[in-house]
């Protein structure tokens, strides 16, 4: 079937208007918060060698079912990145960025071939924070910083309807014992499991706990819990973590079935779940945890790391539902009726933009009536224009909301005054 040229691919979208404005505002919040918490921005390629993901997430759905893979003209197998942590770890190993503890932040598009639905796309944006190569005895403080950072971001975004879920997956040895017990348990219910989960019994039964369909089944809810396999050291670590969260009055819920969707997570994991019902179901807004075994895939041993990633589209949906986001209106429209006035207004526009005012102007002369129609359609708060028989070095300034008209000295513009009238119009 011939595809229409005027449709974007399934699972993708265009940002414009209100959505684009919110996206820019959200991105600004993330960059500001990253700076406040001393995270350095890192940019990795949108595509990587496929084995970076095939090696680090062999059983995860994002590799087994959702990875966009292709071969280049030289026969190298590449993949569009489905997540941001593995590429950052590759970069850390490649550039030897591991001499001391590092704090990285990223913001960009990811790609997964999954069924598009509300809050899920095939191209989607993630913002992520990673703390790499921290000291083992500082785990609870690393977790505290991550949680406080998330709460600070949500506060700036005006998002306050969520619950925090946490779990502790222990180390590889304990987890393997737990997985063996899970497999034995789920074998008894194999006839009630989805086809993919029957495969997971042998490959990684933890994935069954993470499956949205399986989670609703009673026998899955009653499956063995990881905490019954904790060592005394695990219990002590978990108690230190919860104690420090309580010290900072952070409300959380322990969910022993929480495992996260990527294979490399261990020790502490968490999710912030939306409770606003905006997304139609309780989806994670941000999730993450420790990934101490992932660095070994890149030749980095004894390398403690923790991180998390936000789903940007989900945040945008919630922000859209919470308040009426106004389009970014111009401060001033510079209206010209002659070519000479266009040149003068270009000079004025340069001056105003230098002072951070939002400005536009017409580049073709208009009649008075059509010119003011254009100015009103632009959404500007005020319009500058030259009147007939205007006093020398003066220009007229009209408030498009009130209709008030005044004369401004063109050669000595009072920026403080302009700022005050803009602010007054926004509060009107």
From Swiss-Prot:
Gene3D superfamilies: Anticodon-binding domain (3.40.50.800), Bira Bifunctional Protein, Domain 2 (3.30.930.10). It comes from the Bacteria. It is found in: Cytoplasm. Its EC number is 6.1.1.21. HAMAP family: His_tRNA_synth (MF_00127). Homodimer. This is Histidine--tRNA ligase. It comes from Mesomycoplasma hyopneumoniae (strain 232). The lineage of its organism: Bacteria, Bacillati, Mycoplasmatota, Mycoplasmoidales, Metamycoplasmataceae.
């Amino acid at each position: 079937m011939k595809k229409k040229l005027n449709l974007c691919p399934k699972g993708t979208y265009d940002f414009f208007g209100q959505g684009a404005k919110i996206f820019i505002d959200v991105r600004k919040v993330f960059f500001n918060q990253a700076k406040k918490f001393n995270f350095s921005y890192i940019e990795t390629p949108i595509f990587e060698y496929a084995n970076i993901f095939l090696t680090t997430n062999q059983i995860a759905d994002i590799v087994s079912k959702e990875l966009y893979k292709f071969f280049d003209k030289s026969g190298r197998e590449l993949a569009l990145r489905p997540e941001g942590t593995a590429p950052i770890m590759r970069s850390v190993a490649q550039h030897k960025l591991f001499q001391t503890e590092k704090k990285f932040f990223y913001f960009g598009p990811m790609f997964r071939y999954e069924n598009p639905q509300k809050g899920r796309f095939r191209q989607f944006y993630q913002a992520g924070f990673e703390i790499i190569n921290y000291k083992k005895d500082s785990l609870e403080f690393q977790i505290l910083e991550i949680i406080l950072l998330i709460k600070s971001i949500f506060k700036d975004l005006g998002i306050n309807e969520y619950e925090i879920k946490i779990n502790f997956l222990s180390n590889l040895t304990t987890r393997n014992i737990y997985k063996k017990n899970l497999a034995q348990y789920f074998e008894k219910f194999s006839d009630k499991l989805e086809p993919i989960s029957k495969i997971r019994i042998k490959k990684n039964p933890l994935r069954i706990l993470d499956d949205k369909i399986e989670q609703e089944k009673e026998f899955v809810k009653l499956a063995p819990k990881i905490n019954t396999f904790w060592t005394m050291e695990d219990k002590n670590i978990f108690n230190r973590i919860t104690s420090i969260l309580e010290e900072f009055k952070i409300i959380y819920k322990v969910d022993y079935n929480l495992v996260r969707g990527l294979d490399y997570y261990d020790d502490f994991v968490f999710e912030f779940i939306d409770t606003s019902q905006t997304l139609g179901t309780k989806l994670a807004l941000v999730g993450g945890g420790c990934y101490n075994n992932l660095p070994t895939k890149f030749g980095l041993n004894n390398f403690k790391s923790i991180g998390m990633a936000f789903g940007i589209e989900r945040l945008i949906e919630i922000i859209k539902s919470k308040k009426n986001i106004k389009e970014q209106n111009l401060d001033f429209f510079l209206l010209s009726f002659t070519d000479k006035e266009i040149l003068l207004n270009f000079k004025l526009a340069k001056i105003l933009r230098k002072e951070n005012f939002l400005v536009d102007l017409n580049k073709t002369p208009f009649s008075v009536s059509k010119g003011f129609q254009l100015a009103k359609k632009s959404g500007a708060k005020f319009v500058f224009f030259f009147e007939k028989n205007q006093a020398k070095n003066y220009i007229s300034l009209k408030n498009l909301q009130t209709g008030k008209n005044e004369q401004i000295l063109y050669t000595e513009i009072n920026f403080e005054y302009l700022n005050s009238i803009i602010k007054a119009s926004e509060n009107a």
